[in-house]
């Protein structure tokens, strides 16, 4: 019995034990200590019946893990030659998914271990995927599960890497500069509409740039090409990036945008994208308008793009740092409409809560300094 089969068998046993009794409460009820009445009310609002909920969870999760554990992402594996467009450029076109069950930063206890063994990679993958899939689809939720868009329903597969960060060698975000630390603390104090995040305000999606996987599975994107440009569309907020290939210079520093100003070129089979001129109001991990981003996209297999990104901002981090994320091809392909502003009345309560927290923080600071 190979490694993948052995872990899959143990997983099936765990899932079967969890879902064998249709009278027992669903996992979310156990986690959240919800009442039986609340769970039943949630089920009645779902297209799944009580019985089909358990079958749905068990059968789809088992199928997903059976398929996923047959292919493991190995960064050192040989790469396939890239297919070509009609005009001879590497063909990156298609629908791709930016998703991973790998942490951005390497756990401290794995600081000297950049790669898992296959057995360890499958163990980590099964742990994260099982936890993700254990959210009962009969409870009230967004439409991710109904439309097959949760991470555990995607073509994501185990990864030998122990972190998405590949440089520095310890797999951790470099220390912030004093200026970056102050900026990050200021960004955390969000008590006005303009200081809230762009994603929260429906101005920009959660897919960067840079394209670091987000908690929600909104990493769906489409790439199409012309001889003059590569166009990248993300489902999240319907963001569009036009990556010009004409060797023109970047826009003047006074011209800035939320997605930055990008210029692209081909290096062999790899598309290299340099992006500068980010809007100073854009906030990303403490960085703002001084971020210089280099992204690299390579089609390493028929159904896989390799995304690499290096972030440089001397005003924020002590050194540059880089991530690597394999993008599986979406199956089935296609993007959904991303409606955001239409139901964003919750921002009022968010702002109210932020102002209360800010007032409490300022009062505590005054008390600590003896000025109150």
Across the structure, where does each feature detected by a protein language model lie?
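Bacterial N-terminal signal peptides
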Residues: 9-19
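PEST-like low-complexity, intrinsically disordered acidic/proline/serine-rich tracts
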Residues: 21-372
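Bacterial N-terminal signal peptides that target proteins for export
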Residues: 1-9
């Amino acid at each position: 019995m190979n490694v993948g089969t052995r872990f899959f068998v143990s997983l099936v046993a765990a899932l079967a034990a969890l879902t064998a009794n249709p009278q027992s409460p669903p996992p979310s009820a156990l986690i959240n200590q919800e009442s039986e009445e609340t769970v039943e009310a949630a089920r009645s609002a779902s297209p799944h019946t009580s019985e089909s909920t358990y079958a749905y969870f068990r059968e789809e999760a088992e199928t997903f893990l059976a398929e996923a554990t047959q292919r493991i992402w190995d960064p050192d594996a040989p790469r396939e030659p890239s297919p070509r467009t009609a005009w001879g450029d590497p063909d990156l076109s298609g629908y791709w998914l930016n998703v991973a069950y790998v942490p951005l930063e390497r756990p401290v206890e794995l600081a000297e271990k950049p790669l898992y063994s296959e057995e360890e990679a499958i163990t980590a993958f099964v742990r994260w995927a099982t936890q993700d899939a254990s959210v009962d689809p009969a409870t009230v939720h967004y439409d991710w599960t109904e439309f097959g868009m949760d991470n555990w329903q995607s073509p994501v597969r185990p990864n030998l890497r122990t972190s998405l960060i590949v440089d520095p060698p310890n797999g951790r975000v470099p220390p912030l500069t004093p200026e970056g630390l102050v900026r990050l603390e200021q960004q955390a104090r969000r008590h006005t509409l303009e200081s809230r995040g762009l994603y929260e305000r429906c101005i920009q999606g959660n897919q960067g740039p840079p394209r670091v996987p987000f908690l929600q599975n909104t990493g769906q994107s489409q790439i199409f090409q012309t001889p003059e440009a590569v166009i990248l569309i993300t489902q999240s907020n319907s963001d569009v990036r036009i990556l010009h290939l004409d060797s023109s210079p970047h826009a003047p520093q006074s011209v800035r945008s939320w997605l930055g100003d990008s210029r692209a070129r081909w290096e062999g089979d790899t598309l290299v994208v340099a992006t500068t001129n980010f809007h100073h109001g854009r906030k990303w991990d403490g960085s703002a308008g001084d971020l210089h981003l280099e992204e690299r996209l390579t089609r390493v297999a028929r159904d896989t793009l390799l995304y690499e990104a290096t972030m440089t901002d001397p005003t924020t981090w002590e050194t540059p740092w880089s991530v690597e994320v394999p993008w599986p091809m979406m199956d089935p392909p296609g993007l959904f409409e991303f409606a955001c502003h239409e139901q964003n009345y919750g921002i009022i309560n968010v702002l109210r809560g932020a102002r209360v927290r800010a007032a409490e923080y300022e009062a505590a600071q005054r008390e600590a300094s003896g000025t109150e």
